[in-house]
Every structure is written in structure tokens, then in C-alpha cells.
């Protein structure tokens, strides 16, 4: 047994405890050695005593060194992560920026570890991507980040996935069960092509270790395209319920979200991106993977039957059982995460952005709040006559190309008894189009009810000011380039 396990390729799966990740895990465990990456120390402890060839690692995807260690020994890596749920007691920033930072860390770590292939399960997008809603746009950005290194990336794009534990499936079943009469907005006439979770897993398995799929992007879906309206009625048939519907000629996205939130039984934070995504029609484009998949694909009815119990209730999400304990850990850790996107001036490196930040800081808050910069690398935030509030110290040994890191090393506003060291980083992303300024694992000394209404807002104000400064520099560069071009043309 040990010998056969040692010969098998090793697959690292991040997002392995979610509904899709759990199905992938079960399908792959007989053929591969598996590394499950989880941000939850609770899950890492619960799953610690695994079978041969199975390993769980606690891995904070916001920490590039933790991700590097997490992917150590992996031949392949599957990325099934999104940031819909909080990872810190206070999280500031857009979900898109949190997702982008994690994907960038993952791609860099995969390259550093010599991973042979990455697989990513993304979202179907329409042919015209100029006006995408945020949920779809951020999935494309994750694709771009994962594909930015030398590691071959294979992307599968799916729409609605019908499987045990899925959030949107619970929403669908609750709506059908709770509403005998449904008044549907016009966007429910748009077509979708739901796919069974089992078929998603089949597609991932076919791609893994297959050089023909390197660098490829494939749309995948079930055997039938249907409108959302039809999908609701077919779901009612599976549940043995008679439902009446009428369609009204209006879009009403806000009303749709409110209606779904009231009757769908899922948090508002999840309703908002789900409805935004559903309203944009995206069809599965013909491709070889879809042709192969459709031959044995499950119908909507078969997929639903496999996803509910004998009473027609959705099977539980694998994460639900431990979530209260995970929330308690997040609260006990009491740290802050703040990620803000900023423009990157042309020809600026991450080092240039960090240097500009230190040059800009002394202008901040004068004369009451002063920032002194030592040797261009250490910043002291001082409040007269109180003393030093924060000290930022540049970490040269942890600042590779594209990333500049500062540790929070002291100050009156820092809880120095915390388990983690707070840090500020500037990360160049999306091919240099943007910079992410991120605070991680900062432990405030102020009581939380005071911190949230003072220091937390002050940090956002500082980041807003620096963003404006970078926008001004970008505009200056553009104007200078136009003037230079004009002079050259006239001469």
C-alpha cells in the first residue's frame, strides 16, 4: 500500500472543504495523493489523522509564504476558492480585490514549487465582456492572475452547478418550496445550462495531467439549455409540487434580490452576487470538452435527485458543521484585513509605489499627526504630544519582485501581545494595471467598538488619499506622454 501511494501524483486542492471541493476530493482520492489546503485551523485539526496519501494543511492564502509551504510537494493544483465569507474579524475591501490577492499568491507559489499544472473552475461569461457585473469580472481577474506565471493553467467555466451543499441550489429549492405563486421578472427568460456537480468533477479529472488542455479554457454545461423560468418549474416537478408562475415585463434587480433574500434562506452577502450573475445571459460555447461531457451528462432532474434527501431537502453543505467553531476562532484572533485597489502609474514597479508611499506620508496630517521616515525604509506615525502611534519597518528579505512588505513593529495603537505580526504590502497585479495595498493580521489595541469608528476609518482615509495621489501621478504621466508625442510629431 505504501509503495503504491508513493508512486501516485500529488494534487493540492484549495477550497477542498466546500461543496465542489468535497466532491473533487472523494473522486480523486483513489488515484492521487491529496493535499487539502484550508484556511481554518479547526478543519486542519479535525482532519489531521487521515489515511495514507491524504494530508491536510492549514494555509492562509493571504500569506504568500504559507501558500508556498502549502503547495510543497504538489504535482498539480486545483483552485476552488472565493472570498464570500470573512477571513478576519474586520475585513475592509471589495471581494474582487481579496480574490485577486489570493489568486496571485497561489500562482506565484505554484511556480516556485514547480507545479506542473493548475486547474481553475471559473464562471460562464457572455461574449461581450465590456459591461460585466462585479461577480463575473472578478472571476476573469482570477483567471488572469492564475495564468500570469509559467505554470500551465486549465480553466473550466461553468454556470449553475447542481450538487449537494451548493448555496445557490439551497436558494433554488427554498424559493420553489416556499412560493406557490411566483411573479418573475423578464430576465428569468434568459437561458442557462445548469450542470451536475458529478459532471464538473468528470471534466476536472479529464483535464488533470492532460497536456492537451494546458492553456485551454473550456465552457461546460449540462445536456439541456433552458430558461430560469423553465428551471424553476422543472425543479417543482422533481419536488412533487405544483407551482404557478407569471412573468412581468420589468428587470427590477433590486426587487429580485430582496425577494430572493426574504424567501431563499441565504445571507444577503451571497444573494447580491448570485442575482447579479444570473441576470447576464451566458451560453456554453461549443468545444471538444463539452462534446465529450454531454454524452454521459446528467439531466437537471437526475442532478437534483442526487442533491436532495428523501424529503426533498437540500443535502447539507460540508462546511456547515464546523462553521460556528471557525467563526469563534476568527473572533478570538481579533485581527484586521484591509485590501484596497489603486492605479499603478506607468513604468512604476512595486518598489516605486512603496517608495512613493513613504515620500507621500510625511505630508499627511501635519502639524498634529506627523510621519517621520528613517533612511527611506522605516516610518513612524507620531501624534503630538501623545507619542508614536505606529511604526512600519521595511522587510527587504520578504520583498521579491512585484511585492513590497512592511511589518508593523510597534506603536501605541498596536496590540503587541497578538499571535501574529501585522504587515502592510504593496502588490503589483494584472500585468501592472493596478496595485493592491493590503494590511494583514493587524491586532489593534483599541477596543473594537472604538477601533471600528476611529482607527479603521482613518486607515481607509489614508488609503483613499494615497490612491488619489497615484491617480494624479498617472494623469501627469499620460499628459507628459501626449505632449512629448505632439512635439515629436511637429518636429
Question: Model-found features: residue ranges?
Answer:
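N-terminal Rossmann NAD(P)H-binding glycine-rich loop of SDR-like oxidoreductase domains
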Residues: 5-31
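Mid/C-terminal beta-alpha module of Rossmann-like enzyme folds, strongest
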Residues: 9, 206-270, 281-334
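Oxidoreductase cofactor-interface core, primarily capturing Rossmann-like NAD(P)-dependent enzymes
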Residues: 19, 128-241, 258, 265-266
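NAD(P)H-binding glycine-rich loop region in Rossmannoid oxidoreductase-like domains
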Residues: 42-46, 50-113, 124-131
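Hydrophobic ligand-binding cavity/cleft-lining segments
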Residues: 298-301, 305-397
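Hydrophobic-ligand binding "helix-grip"
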Residues: 385-430
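Beta-strand/loop substructures that line and gate deep hydrophobic ligand-binding cavities in soluble
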Residues: 414-453
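A conserved amphipathic terminal alpha-helix motif
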Residues: 450-488
Amino acid at each position: 500500500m505504501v509503495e503504491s501511494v508513493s508512486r501516485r501524483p500529488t494534487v493540492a486542492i484549495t477550497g477542498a472543504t466546500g461543496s465542489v471541493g468535497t466532491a473533487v476530493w472523494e473522486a480523486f482520492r483513489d488515484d492521487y495523493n491529496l493535499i487539502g489546503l484550508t484556511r481554518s485551523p479547526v478543519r486542519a485539526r479535525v482532519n489531521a489523522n487521515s489515511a495514507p496519501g491524504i494530508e491536510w494543511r492549514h494555509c492562509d492564502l493571504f500569506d504568500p509564504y504559507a501558500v508556498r509551504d502549502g503547495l510543497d510537494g504538489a504535482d498539480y493544483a486545483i483552485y476552488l476558492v472565493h472570498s464570500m465569507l470573512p477571513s478576519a474579524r474586520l475585513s475592509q475591501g471589495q471581494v474582487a480585490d481579496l480574490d485577486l490577492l489570493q489568486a496571485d499568491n497561489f500562482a506565484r507559489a505554484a511556480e516556485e514549487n514547480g507545479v506542473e499544472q493548475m486547474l481553475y473552475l471559473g464562471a460562464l461569461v457572455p461574449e461581450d465582456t465590456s459591461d460585466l457585473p462585479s461577480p463575473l469580472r472578478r472571476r476573469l481577474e482570477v483567471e488572469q492572475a492564475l495564468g500570469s506565471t509559467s505554470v500551465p493553467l486549465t480553466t473550466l467555466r461553468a454556470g449553475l452547478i447542481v450538487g449537494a451543499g451548493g448555496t445557490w441550489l439551497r436558494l433554488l429549492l427554498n424559493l420553489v418550496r416556499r412560493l406557490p405563486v411566483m411573479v418573475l421578472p423578464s430576465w428569468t427568460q434568459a437561458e442557462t445550462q445548469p450542470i451536475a456537480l458529478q459532471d464538473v468533477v468528470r471534466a476536472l479529472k479529464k483535464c488533470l495531467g492532460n497536456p492537451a488542455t494546458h492553456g485551454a479554457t473550456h465552457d461546460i454545461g449540462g445536456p439541456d439549455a433552458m430558461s430560469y423560468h423553465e428551471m424553476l418549474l422543472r425543479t417543482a416537478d422533481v419536488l412533487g409540487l405544483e407551482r404557478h408562475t407569471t412573468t412581468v415585463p420589468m428587470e427590477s434587480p433590486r426587487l429580485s434580490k430582496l425577494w430572493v433574500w426574504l424567501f431563499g434562506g441565504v445571507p444577503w452577502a451571497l444573494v447580491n452576487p448570485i442575482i447579479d450573475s444570473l441576470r447576464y445571459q451566458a451560453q456554453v460555447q461549443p468545444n471538444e470538452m463539452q462534446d465529450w461531457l454531454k454524452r454521459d451528462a446528467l439531466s437537471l432532474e437526475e442532478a437534483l435527485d442526487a442533491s436532495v434527501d428523501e424529503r426533498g431537502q437540500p443535502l447539507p453543505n460540508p462546511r456547515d458543521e464546523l462553521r460556528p467553531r471557525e467563526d469563534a476562532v476568527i473572533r478570538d484572533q481579533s485581527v484586521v484585513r484591509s485590501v484596497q485597489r489603486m492605479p499603478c502609474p506607468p513604468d512604476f514597479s512595486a518598489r516605486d509605489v512603496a517608495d512613493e508611499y513613504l515620500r507621500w506620508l510625511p505630508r499627511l496630517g501635519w502639524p498634529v499627526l506627523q510621519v517621520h521616515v528613517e533612511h527611506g525604509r522605516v516610518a513612524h506615525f507620531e501624534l503630538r504630544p501623545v507619542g508614536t502611534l505606529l511604526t512600519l519597518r521595511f522587510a527587504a528579505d520578504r520583498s521579491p519582485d512585484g511585492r513590497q512588505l512592511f511589518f508593523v513593529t510597534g506603536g501605541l495603537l498596536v496590540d503587541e501581545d497578538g499571535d501574529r505580526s501585522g504587515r502592510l504590502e504593496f502588490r503589483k497585479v494584472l500585468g501592472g494595471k493596478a496595485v493592491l495595498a493590503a494590511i494583514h493580521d493587524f491586532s489593534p489595541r483599541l477596543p473594537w467598538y472604538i477601533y471600528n469608528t476611529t482607527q479603521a476609518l482613518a486607515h481607509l482615509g489614508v488609503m483613499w488619499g494615497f490612491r488619489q495621489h497615484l491617480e494624479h501621478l498617472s494623469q501627469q504621466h499620460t499628459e507628459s506622454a501626449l505632449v512629448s508625442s505632439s512635439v515629436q510629431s511637429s518636429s
